[in-house]
Amino acid sequence: MFRGASAINLDTKGRIAIPKRYREPLHAEFNSQIVITVDFQSPCLLLYPFDEWSKIEAKLLLLSDTRATERAMKRLLLGYAHECELDGNGRILLPPPLRQYANLEKRAMLVGQLNKFELWDETAWQKQIEQSRETIQSEEFADNERLADFSL
């Protein structure tokens, strides 16, 4: 399970180094294989261990190609999907279209989301955090039944 936020840098070739604390679990459990795609709701990338991505693909197979919204989701997620493997230094290469989608240039945030990572441009991440704080303080949050009994 992946948790926590790590500040990372892209090198001149568009590679990122996965923090050391994640490398061993990724290697041992997932043979260092990752699938990267776009988040269709936010300007960030999603990095899935290959086994987790297989579950997403199974769900995508159930979507219709004749319904425009379902087809659009499949086209976006699968069209951008890129398989990669950590190199000997724990790095992965982000293809230019993926870097462009998330506006990734130099400084980024790798954020654990249990079964996957989100990869954000550092400035976009800070804006998103502020928006999340505002959402948590809103009436919409207070009225959410699924969160009514959630406590820390």
UniProtKB/Swiss-Prot annotation:
The segment(s) forming the SpoVT-AbrB domain are 5-52, 81-124
- Record-linked CDD domains: MraZ_C, MraZ_N
Keyword Transcription regulation (UniProt):
yes
**InterPro entries assigned:** MraZ, MraZ_C, MraZ_dom, MraZ_N, MraZ_sf, SpoVT-AbrB_dom, SpoVT-AbrB_sf
GO molecular function annotation = DNA-binding transcription factor activity; transcription cis-regulatory region binding
Q: Which GO terms describe its cellular component?
A: cytoplasm; nucleoid
| Lineage top rank: taxon | Bacteria
- Which cysteine residues pair off into disulfide bonds? none
Query: Where found in the cell?
Result: Cytoplasm, Nucleoid
In this record, what's one Pfam family? MraZ
Q: Recite the UniProt keywords alphabetically.
A: Cytoplasm, DNA-binding, Repeat, Transcription, Transcription regulation
- TM segment ranges: none
Question: What GO biological process terms does the UniProt entry carry, in alphabetical order?
Answer: negative regulation of DNA-templated transcription initiation
How does the annotation summarize its subunit structure?
Answer: Forms oligomers.
The family annotation for this protein states: Belongs to the MraZ family.
What is the name attached to this protein's record?
Transcriptional regulator MraZ
User: What organism, scientifically named, is this protein from?
Assistant: Shewanella sediminis (strain HAW-EB3)
